[in-house]
Amino acid sequence: MTTRRRAAFGALQTKAGGRMNMDNEVSAGLAPFCMRVADLVVRIRPLHAMVGRLCKDYVVDASLAVDIEIGATQADIDYERDMATEGTDWTDAYLETLAVQRAIANRLPEQHRLLSHGAVIEFEGRAYLFTAPSGAGKSTHIRLWRQYLGDAVRVINGDKPFVRIPECREELPVVYGTPWAGKEGWQRNDSAPLAGIVLLSRSEPGASSIRPASAALNIDKLMRQVYFPPDAEASMLTLDLLDAMLARVPVYDLACDMSEDAVRASFEGLTGLDYHDYVRSASHED
């Protein structure tokens, strides 16, 4: 781990704090269910029906071998309420869905996986992760890709994808859809190899551009878009996984407005294809 990354990690850990207690209370009243997410079978002991409805696209046979077992307590729900910066009238049922997400995320590093904050699209079998602080325009940019490129673009997840980093250094990380998909609800139970990570920012109108970026020089930004568990060992493992991911996946800076030219810039920079040639070819095929 580089000195820069250790320093950024130390600052992040200082702010992290928190406590979670996900595994010591059995839910009453509702039957446990199993879901498959990021190629892991997770057994959930729900307190409220909402979490089951949220995960319905991922539910699998309960007889499968379980990789992770979790269940949120009322204390965990109260913790999520304390962590909320808005929406203090959220119900316990909704907050349980956040607590379950956090519980799974806390266990991902031991399975060579991590949770990222970003929107993921898949184009021709390769995934691209757009990440930025909330409100920077990720969803708008994804919506423009879908508007101008149609069914050739699939959204894997709009907010909280999981990423698996294979132990083999020759293999690309794989990004997965999850039920936690932001206010748009863009998600699918699918996966694709991760071919690019995009640091998105807004540009002046007509000034959209994309360029390769240094992962080392942008490590602070990248770390802020990855979930680090409160457990020190799991956090260190997450940092190792992030290092491994960045060693295999190129990073880009994208400055974009809300126009078709923003799609052209990011499309050409990420895929290496000529945007207008591709659009003409696709229209002829239709």
Predicted regions and their residues:
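Intrinsically disordered, low-complexity regions
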Residues: 11, 18-19, 72, 88, ...
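Charged, amphipathic alpha-helical linker segments immediately N-terminal to NTP-binding catalytic cores
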Residues: 60-104, 270
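Glycine-rich, often acidic-flanked micro-motifs
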Residues: 23-32, 38-56, 63, 89-90, ...
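Conserved glycine(s) of the Walker
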Residues: 137
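N-terminal amphipathic/basic-hydrophobic helices that include classical n-h-c signal peptides
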Residues: 1-20
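Post-Walker A alpha-helix
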Residues: 141-142
